[in-house]
């Protein structure tokens, strides 16, 4: 017998520090591992595998530029700056080198354990028949 479906779980790069280890994204379009950090791998999609792919992603890393941008936007919002001014100011502060430096929280092990349990419980509730 061959597989009827693939369920792929992947770590994602967050676009906001507020989402780090706090959201779970689900899609039926598959995933391209490493694409969020510029480390592209072969796609895991229905097109490539010939069977449906459900992708579950958890933002577990964030680039340094995002951390700085979130911080600066917070400061500028407190000072009631105009949105256009805020964005221009933040972009001028962020070095392109910071877009390639990724960090995670110091409690990543605990967060991954908690998130993996949550995902496994959801999958069990979905696919394991109740007796």
Language model: regions and residue ranges:
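N-terminal small/polar loop signature for handling phosphorylated ligands or for N-terminal nucleophile
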Residues: 1-2
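Structural motif
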Residues: 5-7
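A structural signal for small-residue-enriched, beta-sheet-centric alpha/beta enzyme cores
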Residues: 9-131
């Amino acid at each position: 017998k061959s597989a009827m479906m693939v369920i792929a779980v992947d770590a994602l790069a967050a676009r906001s520090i507020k989402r780090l280890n706090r959201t779970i994204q689900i899609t039926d379009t598959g995933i391209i591992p490493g694409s969020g950090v510029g480390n592209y791998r072969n796609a895991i999609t229905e097109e490539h595998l010939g069977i449906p792919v459900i992708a579950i992603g958890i933002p577990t890393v964030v680039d340094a530029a995002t951390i700085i941008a979130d911080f600066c936007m917070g400061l500028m919002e407190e000072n009631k700056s105009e949105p256009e001014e805020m964005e221009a100011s933040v972009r001028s502060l962020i070095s392109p080198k910071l877009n390639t430096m990724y960090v995670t929280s110091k409690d990543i092990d605990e967060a991954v354990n908690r998130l993996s349990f949550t995902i496994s419980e959801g999958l069990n509730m979905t696919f394991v028949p109740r007796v």
